[in-house]
Amino acid sequence: GVIDAAKKVVNVLKNLF
């Protein structure tokens, strides 16, 4: 869902920074 996608994006950003 949209929420799951948003959480995935947040996790990726955290990994990058």
Swiss-Prot record:
What keywords are assigned to this protein? Amidation, Amphibian defense peptide, Antibiotic, Antimicrobial, Secreted
Q: Where in the cell is it found?
A: Secreted
Superkingdom of the source species: Eukaryota
Q: Which GO biological process categories is it annotated with? A: defense response to bacterium
Q: Which residues carry this modification: Phenylalanine amide?
A: 17
Q: Which GO terms describe its cellular component?
A: extracellular region
Where in the body, by tissue, does this protein show up?
Answer: Expressed by the skin dorsal glands.
Q: What does this protein do?
A: Shows antibacterial activity against B.cereus, L.lactis, L.innocua, M.luteus, S.aureus, S.epidermidis and S.uberis.
* Name listed for the protein in its UniProt record: Uperin-3.6
Give the organism the record lists: Uperoleia mjobergii (Mjoberg's toadlet)
